[in-house]
Regions:
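Flexible hinge/capping segments at coil-to-helix
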Residues: 16-58
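Paired acidic/hydrophobic, glycine-rich loop segments that form the ligand-binding mouth/hinge
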Residues: 1-5, 9-11, 102-107
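Conserved beta-strand scaffold positions in the cores of enzyme catalytic domains, especially
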Residues: 24, 58, 84-86, 121
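Secondary-structure junction motif
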Residues: 6, 10, 50, 54-79, ...
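Beta-alpha-beta core module
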Residues: 18-25, 29-31, 91-140
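Short amphipathic alpha-helical coupling segments at ligand-binding clamshell hinges
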Residues: 49, 141-155
Length: 159
C-alpha cells in the first residue's frame, strides 16, 4: 500500500512495519498542500495557512471506529476544526470541496486527467514534511502486476 510518514506518525508506523516484516520504500518527500476548488476565495494564493482556512469546512476520510488516528489519510485529522466533514469516498470529497469551498490536506500530487480542472493544490505554509512511499513484505517479491504498479507510482511522482 501507499502511505505517508511524518513526525507525528513515524514511530508508530515504523514499529508496525518492522513487526510485520515489511519494508517502507520512499517515493518522494513533499510539503503539505491543500486541495481546494479553483473558485475558492484563497485559490489565487501562492501559500495558505491553517489559520486562514479555519472558517472553511475541513474534509477528511472516515477511518472507521476501530482505526487509529496514526493511520489517517490526512496529516491533520486529529486536530479540531470549526467545521469538519467526514466522507467515505474521493468523489464526495471533491464535490464538497467545490460546492462548500471546503479543503483537505494532501501531498500536493494531483492528476488533472483523473480529477479534472476544478481542484487545485496550494502549498500549506509551515506544517512540516511528509515522506510518501509504499510498503512491501521483506521476504516476498512483488508480483509482475505489483512491479507494474510500482513503476506507475514512480512515473506519477516524477511528473
Amino acid at each position: 500500500g501507499v502511505l505517508y510518514m511524518n513526525d507525528f506518525n513515524r514511530v508508530v508506523l515504523e514499529k508496525e512495519i518492522k513487526s510485520h516484516k515489511l519494508v517502507f520504500h520512499e517515493l518522494m518527500q513533499a510539503e503539505p498542500h491543500v486541495f481546494i476548488s479553483r473558485k475558492h476565495p484563497l485559490a489565487d494564493r501562492n501559500k495558505v495557512t491553517m489559520n486562514e482556512l479555519q472558517d472553511y469546512p475541513y474534509l477528511s476520510f472516515e477511518q472507521g471506529e476501530h482505526n487509529s488516528f496514526y493511520y489517517s489519510e490526512e496529516i491533520f485529522s486529529v486536530e479540531e476544526k470549526k467545521k469538519n466533514i467526514r466522507v467515505r469516498d474521493r468523489a464526495t470529497l471533491f464535490n464538497l470541496l467545490i460546492g462548500l469551498n471546503g479543503f483537505t490536506v494532501c501531498s500536493g500530487v494531483i492528476d488533472e486527467e483523473l480529477n479534472g480542472k476544478d481542484i487545485i493544490a496550494v502549498p500549506l505554509e509551515g506544517e512540516g514534511g511528509m515522506h510518501i512511499g509504499y510498503i512491501t513484505h521483506r521476504n516476498i517479491s512483488l508480483s509482475r502486476l505489483g512491479e507494474i504498479y510500482v513503476e506507475a507510482l514512480k512515473r506519477c511522482v516524477l511528473t
